[in-house]
């Protein structure tokens, strides 16, 4: 990446593709290779996609030029997208306030409770002999554990998931339905009431503590944080549960290895998240002219940073299209990088390690349903399997 403001555009050829035509639904390896092969900057559907490792990592580390706020805070929306749609120094404050609640030390205190819920959820499935893993587990599991930590009632889980699904569907439709609008309103009303209740009657949960600490978040900030976590904060675990169980169903030798050596589950989880991140790109908007891959992007250019393409770019032995199970946890960028690196990465790893370990404990051998062909929902902002039918005896 060239220094911002330098102009070396010259005669640059800008590839133009249609996002929906990329072969992502069946094979992300082929899809991201198609994009990388097209060029370092590819224009699709109004966005400039950066596909090369050097450029993606430089942009992730430079929020001054590649702004999250301009990309993620909807104009005119009074609800702040905390902390995602803020750049330093505002983002630095949010990170400082929130980080302690998602640190390994804090999560270790919650581990017994999270483990109990994990065991119970898989136990409810194990006796069936079959399940549709996305609907029966992947969509529910991260929500249930989130509610435990965050301080929302467990009995509201399914209602919150329903609202979340409706609001996300609304964002993908050109014209929202009355039901979509009603769901969005009901979710906001629910969260407003819960934030106010925790402010009046605080407990040990995250929702209470962020409102009463040394530097408490305001009511509107907590509402924005809660709204973001419900709508977009849990997709990584949902997607990774599905892809983890898919790979384990395909690979009996891998199942046996992880049962015999549970410490390798962490390696497996890192590889699943590297290969199949639910949020494969990071949106940004440039704040000043910047030259990338030979092209000068003017200020105000909408950009998407393709972390998933970087994770599979073949630049080293660990950045391949295959699981690398060599006993080591290799670095990747599925959780982003720079100041906006995923705040919940430790929680995601913990949840996935618990789930895979307990699944193999209760359901050691299982297989895919006959004639099943895995596909993700595409085009979509979040990559996850449409469904995952499993069976066992």
Regions found by a protein language model. Name each.
Residues 1-393:
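Cytochrome P450
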């Amino acid at each position: 990446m060239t220094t911002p403001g330098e102009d070396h555009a010259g005669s640059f050829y800008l590839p133009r593709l249609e996002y929906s035509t990329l072969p992502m639904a069946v094979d992300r390896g082929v899809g991201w290779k198609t994009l990388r092969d097209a060029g370092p900057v590819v224009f699709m559907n109004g966005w400039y996609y950066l596909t090369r490792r050097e450029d993606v990592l430089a942009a992730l580390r430079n929020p001054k030029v590649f702004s999250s706020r301009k990309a993620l805070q909807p104009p005119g929306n009074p609800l702040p997208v905390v902390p995602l749609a803020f750049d330093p120094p505002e983002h630095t404050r949010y990170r400082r306030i929130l980080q302690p609640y998602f640190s390994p030390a804090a999560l270790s205190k919650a581990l017994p409770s999270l483990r109990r819920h994990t065991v119970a959820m898989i136990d409810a499935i194990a006796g069936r002999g079959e399940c549709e893993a996305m609907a029966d587990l992947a969509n529910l599991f991260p929500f249930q554990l989130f509610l435990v930590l965050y301080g929302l009632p467990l009995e509201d889980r399914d209602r919150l998931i329903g609202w979340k699904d409706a609001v996300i569907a609304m964002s993908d439709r050109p014209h929202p339905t009355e039901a979509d609008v009603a769901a969005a309103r009901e979710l906001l009303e629910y969260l407003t009431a819960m934030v106010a209740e925790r402010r009046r009657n605080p407990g040990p949960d995250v929702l209470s503590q962020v409102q009463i600490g040394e530097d408490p978040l305001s009511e509107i900030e907590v509402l924005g944080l809660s709204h973001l976590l419900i709508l977009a904060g849990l997709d990584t675990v949902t997607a990774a549960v599905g892809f983890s169980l898919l790979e384990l169903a395909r690979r009996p030798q891998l199942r046996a290895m992880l049962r015999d050596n549970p410490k390798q589950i962490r390696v497996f989880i890192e590889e699943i998240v590297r290969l199949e991140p639910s949020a494969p790109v990071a949106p940004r908007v440039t704040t000043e002219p910047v030259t990338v891959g030979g092209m000068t992007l003017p200020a105000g250019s909408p950009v998407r940073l393709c972390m998933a393409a970087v994770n599979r770019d073949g630049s080293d032995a660990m950045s391949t299209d295959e699981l690398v199970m060599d006993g080591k946890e290799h670095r990747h960028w599925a959780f982003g990088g720079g100041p906006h690196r995923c705040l919940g990465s430790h929680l995601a790893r913990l949840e996935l390690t618990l789930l895979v370990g307990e699944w193999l404990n209760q359901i050691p051998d299982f297989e895919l349903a006959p004639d099943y062909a895995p596909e993700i929902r595409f085009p979509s902002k979040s990559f996850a399997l449409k469904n995952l039918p499993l069976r066992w005896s």
